[in-house]
């Protein structure tokens, strides 16, 4: 089941989302846009289970990482509009 994982440029490179992910979807990659010189990346979105632990772990007020659940998941959860 494919979910979309978006990482925004408000990421501070803290690695909290990477550590929170139970399926190792995320990893840190070099990036000059923040003090930590790294940003989260989601190279393995096919393994995402949609638990949103990465979102919960994000310490920024902007939720620098967002998981958008696939259509099949939202339908089975009764979230389809």
Curated annotation (Swiss-Prot):
One of its GO terms (biological process) is photosynthetic electron transport in photosystem I. Keywords: 4Fe-4S, Cyanelle, Electron transport, Iron, Iron-sulfur, Membrane, Metal-binding, Oxidoreductase, Photosynthesis, Photosystem I, Plastid, Repeat, Thylakoid, Transport. [4Fe-4S] cluster 2 binds at residues 21, 48, 51, 54. Residues 2-31, 39-68 form the 4Fe-4S ferredoxin-type domain. It holds the Pfam family Fer4_7. PROSITE patterns: 4FE4S_FER_1 (PS00198), 4FE4S_FER_2 (PS51379). Binds 2 [4Fe-4S] clusters. Cluster 2 is most probably the spectroscopically characterized electron acceptor FA and cluster 1 is most probably FB. It catalyses: reduced [plastocyanin] + hnu + oxidized [2Fe-2S]-[ferredoxin] = oxidized [plastocyanin] + reduced [2Fe-2S]-[ferredoxin]. Its main location: plastid. It comes from the Eukaryota. It is found in: Plastid, Cyanelle thylakoid membrane. [4Fe-4S] cluster 1 binds at residues 11, 14, 17, 58. Its EC number is 1.97.1.12. One of its GO terms (cellular component) is cyanelle thylakoid membrane. Its cofactor is [4Fe-4S] cluster. The keyword Ribonucleoprotein does not apply. GO terms for molecular function: 4 iron, 4 sulfur cluster binding; electron transfer activity; metal ion binding; oxidoreductase activity. It is a peripheral membrane protein. InterPro entries: 4Fe4S_Fe-S-bd, 4Fe4S_Fe_S_CS, PSI_iron-sulfur_center, PSI_PsaC. The keyword Oxidoreductase applies. The eukaryotic PSI reaction center is composed of at least 11 subunits. Apoprotein for the two 4Fe-4S centers FA and FB of photosystem I (PSI); essential for photochemical activity. FB is the terminal electron acceptor of PSI, donating electrons to ferredoxin. The C-terminus interacts with PsaA/B/D and helps assemble the protein into the PSI complex. Required for binding of PsaD and PsaE to PSI. PSI is a cytochrome c6-ferredoxin oxidoreductase, converting photonic excitation into a charge separation, which transfers an electron from the donor P700 chlorophyll pair to the spectroscopically characterized acceptors A0, A1, FX, FA and FB in turn. This is Photosystem I iron-sulfur center. It comes from Cyanophora paradoxa. The gene is psaC.
